[in-house]
Amino acid sequence: MPRPVTVIDSNVTNAVHQVMDAMQAPVYFETYIIKGKNMNHLTWEVVDSIRKNKVCLNGRVNNSLCGGARKELDLFASLVDCFNLNGQPSRHENVDIVVIRENTEGEYAGREHEVVPGVIESFQVTMTKFWSDRIAKYAFEYAHFSKRKKVTAVHNNGKYEKLADAFFLESCQEVAKMYPNITYNEIASRETRAIRRHSNSKSLWAIIANIASGVAGGSFGDDYAIFEQVGSVGNHKNPVALLFSSVMMLRHLLLPLFADRLKTAVTRVISEGKCGNSNTTTQEVVDSVIANLD
């Protein structure tokens, strides 16, 4: 039976439609166009569709678009898949990292208000034990089911939020004991040269995702999931990032054979150098991906 998916339309979502049709993937889309005054947030109509379908593919590059939905749908885990692509130059080699962070507390809570006209106060919500435990369990569960051998907790070494860091690490250490087959370690910002170059920033998780060339990602909760291209590689013409996010979506929908076919086809097209040319049209990339489907 076809799986329903809510789609937030963009210039590249039609590419996903075409490739899914070519694969005869058992999914169908409910498409919504976000424009005008709704560009920075999801309408209730879209949120209701996500509640019904459980899965959303966000074609928009605007990172703030789904901010409200993360809280409304309790999408507590952000996941960014970082990996090298043959045919694409990269500062780092042999990258295969999944970056997971808490999506609804701490610096990503997005709590702010206007104290008096012209003065905005922005503040963070300290990590609670419940949310610290939950994101730690999510990371180890993901590592377990994806057959990854190591989980690394990245923290600020108490430089900015000493109590919050201690809280987070305590949760990770407790959860790690339940997964003896997974190696657990901790890295402070001062121990990583790449992070130290950005030591004035608190967003270590975002920095790592960008340095490691995050391609595809999503936000996940117990009941719902939104898949989207990573903001740093979002492109209004090139559909590759959204196609890789669609690979993640297909795995989430328990359609691994279709996910493997799509990932193989996109990887082939990239290795052949058919995506790096600025003169290449979206349709040419789509046609090449379809031609490479097994």
UniProtKB/Swiss-Prot annotation:
Domain of life of the native organism: Eukaryota
Any Pfam family matching the protein: Iso_dh
SUPFAM superfamilies named in the record: Isocitrate/Isopropylmalate dehydrogenase-like
InterPro entries named among the record's database cross-references: IsoPropMal-DH-like_dom (IPR024084)
PANTHER family attached to this UniProt entry: DECARBOXYLATING DEHYDROGENASES-ISOCITRATE, ISOPROPYLMALATE, TARTRATE, ISOCITRATE DEHYDROGENASE [NAD] REGULATORY SUBUNIT 1, MITOCHONDRIAL-RELATED
Family: Belongs to the isocitrate and isopropylmalate dehydrogenases family.
This protein's name: Putative isocitrate dehydrogenase [NAD] subunit-like 4
Organism: Arabidopsis thaliana (Mouse-ear cress)
Name of the encoding gene: IDH4
